[in-house]
């Protein structure tokens, strides 16, 4: 009986061993990395890290409008907090956030009179915008290296195209070989449309005399059009092209507030759409349409979009003060800023009134 059990045990062990060997063989027979799975030359992408490094971002810190024409909802926080914007979190300890905000107040209050004037706020906005600019310059150095592996300081459109398609999951070596041999790339319609738009943008960033190559500075303009007047103008044209319904290259209020593609399916969506219309109507009438003639020209939109426009910074400073200026003295006290902390930081500092005098 014992010998029979031993035999069955040995047989079972042998079966499990064979099963393990077959599974192991199957694993080693597969590609070493999921990214090697191909569909018509396209690899299965594992993440979009590479894409984020070389694609122009939709969101530009310190710029009033997104690349797609949406208003930048975080603009006020970005130009008030600068790089510290991420430090203000709803989950952060309120007392610590109050102290951070008080420290910022002291920096803005240049003449130390315990209140912030429009000129002081304007100077601060320009400083924080420059901070965002420098951050983009530093990031661009890393991103440029990603598309310039040979380090010659110049990148051709084909070199960028190879890296872009690789970030989308295509086999980099296969794409390079096909481009070298002028062979057709099997690219889906959506990716091709993105490529076409990027190509237009690429050649716009190529400063005269055009050599079809981008250096590091030109690549910065390609990723961040706010760093170049020429590219800022191109960005404005793109936004107007997308919103302009009658082709006159100008924007009426109705064109500017037109809802995004899609239908309202429930009350929550309706509320979102109502907010969209209200916010854009206010921005159009009070800020963008500078001469209030009911028409926004390319020049007006370009001036509105320019983050280094000092006149815009002063207007923004006055608007920010007006939001929290409860005593209507055209200045902001620390208490007023703490009370309207959600506007300035995106984080509501609870029980500010009870604590402000204790702490400061």
UniProtKB/Swiss-Prot annotation:
The keyword Calcium applies. Residues 1-29 form the signal peptide. Ca(2+) 3 binds at residues 244, 246, 248, 250, 255. Ca(2+) 4 binds at residues 289, 291, 293, 300. Its main location: Golgi. Glycans are attached at residue 33. May regulate calcium-dependent activities in the endoplasmic reticulum lumen or post-ER compartment. This is 45 kDa calcium-binding protein. It comes from Xenopus tropicalis. The lineage of its organism: Eukaryota, Metazoa, Chordata, Craniata, Vertebrata. The gene is sdf4.
């Amino acid at each position: 009986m014992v010998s029979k059990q031993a035999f069955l045990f040995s047989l079972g062990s042998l079966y499990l061993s064979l099963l393990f060997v077959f599974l192991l063989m199957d694993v080693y027979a597969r590609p070493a990395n999921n990214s090697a799975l191909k569909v018509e030359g396209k690899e299965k992408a594992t993440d979009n890290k590479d894409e984020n490094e070389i694609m122009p971002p939709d969101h530009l810190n310190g710029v009033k409008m997104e690349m797609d024409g949406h208003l930048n909802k975080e603009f006020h926080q970005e130009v008030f907090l600068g790089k510290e914007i991420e430090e203000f979190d709803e989950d952060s300890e309120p007392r610590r956030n109050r102290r951070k905000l008080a420290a910022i107040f002291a920096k803005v209050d240049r003449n130390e009179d315990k209140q912030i004037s429009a000129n002081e706020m304007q100077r601060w906005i320009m400083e924080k915008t420059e901070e965002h600019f420098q951050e983009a310059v530093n990031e661009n150095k890393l991103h440029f290296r990603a598309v310039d592996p040979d380090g010659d300081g110049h990148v051709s459109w084909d070199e960028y195209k190879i890296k872009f398609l690789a970030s989308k999951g295509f086999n980099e070596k296969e794409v390079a070989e096909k481009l070298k041999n002028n062979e057709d790339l099997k690219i889906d319609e959506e990716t091709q449309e993105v490529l076409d738009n990027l190509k237009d943008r690429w050649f716009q960033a190529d400063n005269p005399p055009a050599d079809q190559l981008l250096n590091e500075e030109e690549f910065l303009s390609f990723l961040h059009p706010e760093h170049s007047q020429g590219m800022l103008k191109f960005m404005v044209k793109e936004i107007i092209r997308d919103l302009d319904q009658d082709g006159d290259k100008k924007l009426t209020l109705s064109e500017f507030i037109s809802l995004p593609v899609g239908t309202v399916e429930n009350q929550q969506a309706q509320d979102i759409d109502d907010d969209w219309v209200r916010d854009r109507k206010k921005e159009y009438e009070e800020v963008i349409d500078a001469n209030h003639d009911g028409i926004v020209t390319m020049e007006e939109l370009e001036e509105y979009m320019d983050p280094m426009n000092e006149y815009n910074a002063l207007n923004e400073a006055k608007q920010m003060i007006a939001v929290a200026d409860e005593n209507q003295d055209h200045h902001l006290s620390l208490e007023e800023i703490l009370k309207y902390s959600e506007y300035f930081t995106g984080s509501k500092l609870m029980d500010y009134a009870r604590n402000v005098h204790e702490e400061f």
